[in-house]
Amino acid sequence: VEAFFACQYAGLVAVPLAIPMGVGQRDSWSAKLQGLLASCQPAAIITGDEWLPLVNAATHNNPELHVLSHAWFKALPEADVALQRPVPNDIAYLQYTSGSTRFPRGVIITHREVMANLRAISHDGIKLRPGDRCVSWLPFYHDMGLVGFLLTPVATQLSVDYLRTQDFAMRPLQWLKLISKNRGTVSVAPPFGYELCQRRVNEKDLAELDLSCW
């Protein structure tokens, strides 16, 4: 999240990419990452410590490509530069399609399009209200995770409770318990998210949930 907003301030194009969800996906993810990097040709990659070996393997330790962990990134000294205010048609970020039917394609998102999307979600769609509280387990490389539950709450100054996607996959009812406990009013998921909860829930779980706030 910090790296994404740092790119916006610095006038750089952010490219959020997926991480492997399971141990068995790492080899296929590494091959997929090579294709994505060849497509977007980044100048730098910022990733978590646990993914550094995989990223370095995918990039073949290319000396021309800066690969940083989050800790290294945060430790960099602050540069004394004049930040440029973005204009509406500047590129805000590059978002890749899911790749469910073909190899993911990068879609250019401008600042104008981001703001239009935020307004459509907050004012025309969900119609957010002061005091709403969001809950999400959607990953930030996912359009609804990034725009719906990161950028929209920032733009509308709402609180958000985040559950790691991996934690939801292992214990989906944690999502519903988080909504119940913190009185979340806004939360969405793809159909499989609801189906996963339905398969895992039992009568005891239902008795402990109060989703009337949602």
Where would I find each of the regions flagged by the language model?
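Structural core segment of the AMP-binding/adenylate-forming
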Residues: Y9-E78, Q84, P190-P191, L196
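Conserved AMP-binding/adenylation subdomain of ANL enzymes
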Residues: M115-R133, D143-T185, L196-E203
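Conserved coil-to-alpha-helix start sites within the AMP-binding
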Residues: V1-Y9, D27-A31, L138-A155, A169, ...
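A short helix-loop-beta submotif of the ANL/AMP-binding
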Residues: V1-G22, G35, S39-A44, D132-R133, ...
